[in-house]
């Protein structure tokens, strides 16, 4: 799941307000859609599932209906569809909040996300217990990521790009135990250039798959990019809620159809390079060629025509 900012002018469009734009790094006037996508990890690509327009909530207005409440409500409405496809939901660090993580756990959905840089965690206590009255000790000392205790974090993956350490810890802000994947990204010399922390609500999840699933989430951004560039995601002039909803979902679904065309004849679990621009060019070429063939009475089944026909279908493509 990921929200996306949609540029839109006017005063009377449903839901228009100020939303965060990742491109400009600030709040801008326009619309926002909350989008669920299905990520095929083997194909390394995303397919649109559902887009719902967000309601604008003034930040200075005292109300219980925050944007996060809308995201939680949308999750509840969509959970049956999500669980019918996969039990794993991947979101970015913005959603690493108690309200959203708790909703995922209550709905039986495993949530994978990135922890904040200042995440406050504590180790689970596994030492000897005292006899006598009182509750047994549950938690140990605080987790200091700047001087990580690698006796408690296990190294589960290592290559030339990164090292992944994992541990079960308790999050004070999320009020639950989580599986933590601590990643050290390495430069060409093998020195640590960057560290990031990821988590899963599934305590049995391995650290490597947490990182792989989170990195696969970025395929959603390509769906937004392709829809904005090639299928008119931001070109709707309607102001009505239903018309806008239809347009957003139709535009994003068009990207799915284009990917389906590109993958025709390709094995289900095979990764390929897909250019939506090339697919649009091929479909336009096919339309014009069929028009010429129909009007000029050309037989496309002749051997020499079949070769030329296929060459002209690829005319103007950019991808190799």
Please provide the spans of the model-predicted regions.
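Short amphipathic alpha-helical "interface-anchor" segments enriched in bulky aromatics
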Residues: 1, 5, 143, 207-238
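Basic, amphipathic alpha-helical segments enriched in Lys/Arg and hydrophobic/aromatic residues
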Residues: 235-291
């Amino acid at each position: 799941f990921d929200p996306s900012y949609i540029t839109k002018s006017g005063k009377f469009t449903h839901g228009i307000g100020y939303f965060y734009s990742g491109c400009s790094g600030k709040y801008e006037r326009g619309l926002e859609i909350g989008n669920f996508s299905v990520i095929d990890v083997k194909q390394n690509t995303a397919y649109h599932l559902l887009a719902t327009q967000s309601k604008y909530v003034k930040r200075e207005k005292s109300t219980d209906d925050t944007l996060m409440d809308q995201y939680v409500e949308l999750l509840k409405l969509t959970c049956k569809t999500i669980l019918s496809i996969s039990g794993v939901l991947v979101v970015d660090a913005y959603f690493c909040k108690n309200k959203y993580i708790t909703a995922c756990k209550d709905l039986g959905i495993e949530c994978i996300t990135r922890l904040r840089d200042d995440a406050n965690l504590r180790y689970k206590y596994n030492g000897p217990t005292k006899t006598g009255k009182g509750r047994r000790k549950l938690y140990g000392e605080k987790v200091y990521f700047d001087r990580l205790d690698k006796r408690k974090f296990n190294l589960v993956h290592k290559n030339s790009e990164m090292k992944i350490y994992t541990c079960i810890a308790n999050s004070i802000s999320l009020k639950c135990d989580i599986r933590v994947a601590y990643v050290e990204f390495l430069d060409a010399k093998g020195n640590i250039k960057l560290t990031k922390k990821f988590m899963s609500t599934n305590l049995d999840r391995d650290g490597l798959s947490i990182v792989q699933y989170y990195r696969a989430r970025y395929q959603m951004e390509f769906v937004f990019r392709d829809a904005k560039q090639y299928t008119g995601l931001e070109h709707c002039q309607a102001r009505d809620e239903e018309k806008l909803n239809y347009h957003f979902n139709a535009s994003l679904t068009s990207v799915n159809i284009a990917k389906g065309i590109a993958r025709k004849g390709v094995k289900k679990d095979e990764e390929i390079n897909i250019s939506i621009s090339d697919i649009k060019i091929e479909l336009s070429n096919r339309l014009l060629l069929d028009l010429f063939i129909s009007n000029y009475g050309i037989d496309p089944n002749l051997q020499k025509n079949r070769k030329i026909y296929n060459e002209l279908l690829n005319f103007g493509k950019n991808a190799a």
